[in-house]
């Protein structure tokens, strides 16, 4: 699928929930809802492409804009200003472990709204990078039936820890005992989402968590590798959009996970 900054096939909605209004880009008119949370760069052409793949599989996609502009013109470039703003923001818990980011309260409300609008058994949710763990915190909401953690890179100061409050974590564990399944994705050499975090997820959730670790050789040469770093962004900048590529197969796997849980 071609990468483009043109998002005429998305509709911007300014949605007020819990007293806070955020722009949400919506695409698709039928099917169960899936919430796609962008990376630290904001909403980019590669995030829009992923949303379209999910939409074309028969889902209605809600992409909340948590930072950056509500367009696909955000560059896949991390700025010091963005890092500082996230670290001092009251909505995000970036550095420290065992805390749920306050913004996840709003995201759970969005999940409830999306479920009301779309119907079906429930809602899917995928977070990426700095938002990766948000899908885990969202899973305390009963309508969230298919949480996916893509290269969860937070908390930044502890490679094995999770960015979720202990009581929230207990709630998610209880849901897995009732049948909830979770999926996670990372590259083997990822320095931002290390293997220790997936080990914690396996230890915490057992067979309810399915973690896929892709070889670094599967990363796009034009992505993080071009900067001399191991690949990181499984479904966006480090994805190779070609048949037989492990990253493209991972997209199909996630879509199958959504179908299995939401239909």
Set out the residue ranges of the language-model regions.
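Serine-hydrolase catalytic machinery in alpha/beta-hydrolase-like enzymes
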Residues: 6-122
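N-terminal targeting or regulatory segments adjacent to alpha/beta-hydrolase or S9 domains
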Residues: 1-7, 27, 56, 236, ...
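Short, hinge-like loop/turn segments at secondary-structure boundaries
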Residues: 78-83, 165-167, 230
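C-terminal catalytic histidine-bearing segment of alpha/beta-hydrolase fold enzymes
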Residues: 208-263
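Primarily recognizes the serine-hydrolase "nucleophile elbow" in alpha/beta-hydrolase
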Residues: 108-164
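Gly/Ala-rich phosphate-binding loop of Rossmann-like dinucleotide-binding domains
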Residues: 55, 139, 202
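The conserved SAM/SAH-binding core of class I Rossmann-like methyltransferase domains
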Residues: 62-64, 150, 185
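The feature captures the conserved acid-bearing segment of alpha/beta-hydrolase catalytic domains
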Residues: 155-217
């Amino acid at each position: 699928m071609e990468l483009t900054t043109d998002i005429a096939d998305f509709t911007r909605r300014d949605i007020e929930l819990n007293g806070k209004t955020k722009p949400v880009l919506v695409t698709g008119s039928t099917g169960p809802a899936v919430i796609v949370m962008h990376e630290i760069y904001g909403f980019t052409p590669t995030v829009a492409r992923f949303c379209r793949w999910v939409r074309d599989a028969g889902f209605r996609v809600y992409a909340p804009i948590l930072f950056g502009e509500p367009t696909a013109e955000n560059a896949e470039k991390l700025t010091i200003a963005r890092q500082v703003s996230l670290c001092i923001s009251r909505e995000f818990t970036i550095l420290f472990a065992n805390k749920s980011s306050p913004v996840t309260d709003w995201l759970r409300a969005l999940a409830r709204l999306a479920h009301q609008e779309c119907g079906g058994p429930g809602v899917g949710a995928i977070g990426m990078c700095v938002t990766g763990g948000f899908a885990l915190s969202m899973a305390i909401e009963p309508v969230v039936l298919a949480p996916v953690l893509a290269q969860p890179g937070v908390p930044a100061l502890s490679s094995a820890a999770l960015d979720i409050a202990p009581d929230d974590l207990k709630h998610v564990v209880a849901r897995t005992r009732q049948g909830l399944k979770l999926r996670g994705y990372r590259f083997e050499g990822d320095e931002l989402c290390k293997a220790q975090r997936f080990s914690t997820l396996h230890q915490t959730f057992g067979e309810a968590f399915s973690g896929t670790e892709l070889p670094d050789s599967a990363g796009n040469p034009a992505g993080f590798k071009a900067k001399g770093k191991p690949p990181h962004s499984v479904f966006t900048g480090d994805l190779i959009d070609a048949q037989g590529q492990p990253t493209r197969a991972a997209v199909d796997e996630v879509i199958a996970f959504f179908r299995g849980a939401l239909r």
